[in-house]
Regions:
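Short-chain dehydrogenase/reductase
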Residues: 1-71, 85-91, 95, 249
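Active-site loop of short-chain dehydrogenase/reductase
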Residues: 45-46, 73-74, 122-136, 175-179, ...
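Conserved Rossmann-fold SDR core element
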Residues: 73-75, 163-169, 173-188, 224-231
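C-terminal helical subdomain
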Residues: 175, 182, 199-250
Length: 250
């Protein structure tokens, strides 16, 4: 919600917010399609809330068709959705291979499908921006086993695959105006992790920090120098002073 709302503050508001499905446990996640749409419209912009299932490719096709039918173009694609189903916190010998396959499909294969649907239109218009949400689970080993302050193999492996996409887009299409980034939000304080040891190890920032960073990446010419790289949203937000009042002065 914070990413969509902040991006609409900077741009023209043509965002389709997503949702997170968690098949392994019931969690309360702040925000919804309705509240995100309301936050956008409160800023005087239009919103088009569309439900989409990362495991259901036809629903992805339908979402893109609806957005293009309503507005005719997509200038920026922010892949912020994640699939957090069964197996994401399983250890190596406990990970069911069918669950691992779903994680890879939801967090890599079908998000690649979405990119393949959207980027050709960007190329026809001379360019566009793609922001892929990364994760520390894709770039580092856990500090401890899952359930003891670390994370499982399945989720990290699926995010590691997706991490390769932005750099590949940059290599293949930067000369044609495609500006692609990976963004690592760091630990975000509204994540409410069930693993208390994990929460103790990582201090977080509010989601508005990553929202401000992504809005800047999608709109600023200065951001082009970061294309093809992994951008850490919290240091970027602090360095560029993108969110007034953050970090708070002690």
């Amino acid at each position: 919600m914070a990413i969509a709302a902040r991006t609409v503050h900077e741009g023209d508001g043509r965002m389709a917010p997503g949702s997170v499905r968690d098949d392994q446990e019931t969690r309360v996640v702040e925000g919804s399609l309705e509240t995100t749409g309301a936050a956008i419209e409160a800023r005087g912009r239009r919103a088009l809330p569309v439900a989409m299932d990362l495991l259901d490719r036809p629903s992805i096709d339908a979402m893109v068709d609806r957005v293009l039918g309503e507005w005719g173009r997509i200038d920026a694609l922010v892949n912020n959705a994640i699939y957090q189903g069964a197996g994401r916190m399983d250890r190596v010998l406990e990970l069911d291979l069918d669950a691992a396959t779903k994680l890879v499909v939801g967090n890599y294969v079908n998000q690649l499908h979405l990119i393949q649907l959207v980027v050709p239109g960007m190329l026809e218009r001379g360019g566009g921006r793609v922001v892929n949400m990364a994760s520390a689970t894709a770039t580092m080993d856990p500090p401890a086993p899952a359930g003891e302050g670390g994370w499982g193999l399945g989720y990290g492996a699926s995010k590691a695959a997706f991490l390769r996409v932005a750099g590949q887009l940059h290599v293949e299409f930067a000369s044609q105006g495609i500006v692609a980034f990976n963004v690592d939000p760091g630990f975000t304080t509204n994540d409410k992790p069930s693993d208390e040891e994990f929460a103790k190890r990582f201090r977080g920032a509010p989601p508005e920090v990553t929202g401000a960073a992504i809005a800047w990446l999608c709109s600023s010419d200065d951001a082009i120098e970061l294309a093809g790289t992994l951008v850490y949203s919290q240091p970027l937000c602090k360095r560029r002073d993108l969110l007034p009042g953050w970090p708070p002065h002690v």
